[in-house]
Amino acid sequence: ILTTQGERFLEEERARREKMKAANELIEAASMETESGLEDILLVRKLLEGYAAEACAERIEPKELQKLKDLQADYLYAIRHGRAGSEEDLALHLKIAHLSGSPSILRMLKLILTDQDAYARFNQAAVRSDEVRENEHESLLAAIEAGDGALARWEMERHLEHVGENLQAYFAGRK
């Protein structure tokens, strides 16, 4: 005999498993091994992270802004000391998603970016010079600090456009 509460639990668990299956299928479809796979992931990132940056800018508190600045400082420290900075960059992007106030956006980005060390592999293909990397987040963080959601979205999308341009150059060099 199954209670109403038990039925509800089983239905929620079934729905959760279906969502995880669909998310895993998306990840498999957008293989990290191909140019088109990386471009697909970049397109999804632009949608999710553009929204996240806008929402973050519109709701951020000074204490949270300082956390973003600290993550940016960690990122700059890493690349200035010869490291790729992938982990620090990922932390910054996920913090912006967290500060958007949308747990769903954060979960989707974590799923897309952390599966099979995807972010480090993405970063390896997309990043070309330390100078570009050092300046890449500055205008985004300034828009967030100003509380300008529309500008923050635009800056995030512009940032990811630069990543896309670097991806194209990376794959052109491999052909």
Regions found by a protein language model. Name each.
Residues 1-47:
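Short linear motifs at protein or domain termini
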Residues 2, 33-40, 60, 81, ...:
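Non-transmembrane, amphipathic alpha-helical segments
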Residues 44-60, 88-127:
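Hydrophobic, amphipathic alpha-helical faces that serve as interaction scaffolds
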Residues 64-78:
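Amphipathic alpha-helical segments enriched in hydrophobic/aromatic residues interleaved with Lys/Arg
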Residues 65, 85, 106, 152-153:
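Solenoid-repeat scaffolds in large eukaryotic assemblies
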Residues 111-175:
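C-terminal all-alpha effector/ligand-binding and dimerization domain
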